[in-house]
Amino acid sequence: MNRDEVQLLGFEIVAYAGDARSKLLEALNAAKDSEFDKAEQLVEEANECIANAHKAQTNLLAQEAKGEDIAYSITMIHGQDHLMTTLLLKDLMKHLIELYKKGS
């Protein structure tokens, strides 16, 4: 996998993870306003974005597992960072939304 291909996967991960992050934060605002159905829908949409980011990540890992040399890319590192922080945010959102539900 050449550097351009790795960089493209990095951009793909950044885009999907960024969309998921935005949806999760929007879900938190919906829960804050007691719009729990909307919050749950947004979390589901975020999960789809995360799944797409994970597919791109898995593609890269599979290539490396096959013994293919993977070019170094700051964009890919940035994408991995975005994905991991979004996964952490998703875990926190579950708990925060539940707290809003208990408080209403």
Swiss-Prot record:
State the source organism's domain of life. Bacteria
Record-listed Mg(2+) binding positions: 81
Q: Where is the PTS EIIA type-3 domain?
A: 1-102
Intracellular or extracellular location(s): Cytoplasm
Gene Ontology molecular function terms on file: metal ion binding; transferase activity
GO biological processes: phosphoenolpyruvate-dependent sugar phosphotransferase system
**Residue list for modification Phosphohistidine:** 78
Report if keyword Cytoplasm is assigned. yes
The induction comment states: Induced by lactose, galactose and galactose-6-P. Repressed by glucose.
Q: Which cofactor does it need?
A: Mg(2+)
Name a GO CC annotation attached to this entry.
cytoplasm
Catalytic residues at 78
According to its UniProt record, where is this protein mainly located?
cytoplasm
The note describing how and how many cofactors are bound reads: Binds 1 Mg(2+) ion per trimer.
Q: Which UniProt keywords apply?
A: Cytoplasm, Magnesium, Metal-binding, Phosphoprotein, Phosphotransferase system, Sugar transport, Transferase, Transport
Q: What is known of its domains?
A: The PTS EIIA type-3 domain is phosphorylated by phospho-HPr on a histidyl residue. Then, it transfers the phosphoryl group to the PTS EIIB type-3 domain.
Q: Which PANTHER family match?
A: PHOSPHOTRANSFERASE SYSTEM SUGAR-SPECIFIC EII COMPONENT, PTS SYSTEM N,N'-DIACETYLCHITOBIOSE-SPECIFIC EIIA COMPONENT
Give the protein's function.
The phosphoenolpyruvate-dependent sugar phosphotransferase system (sugar PTS), a major carbohydrate active transport system, catalyzes the phosphorylation of incoming sugar substrates concomitantly with their translocation across the cell membrane. The enzyme II LacEF PTS system is involved in lactose transport.
Subunit arrangement?
A: Homotrimer.
Protein name, UniProt field: PTS system lactose-specific EIIA component
Lineage, broadest ranks = Bacteria, Bacillati, Bacillota, Bacilli, Bacillales
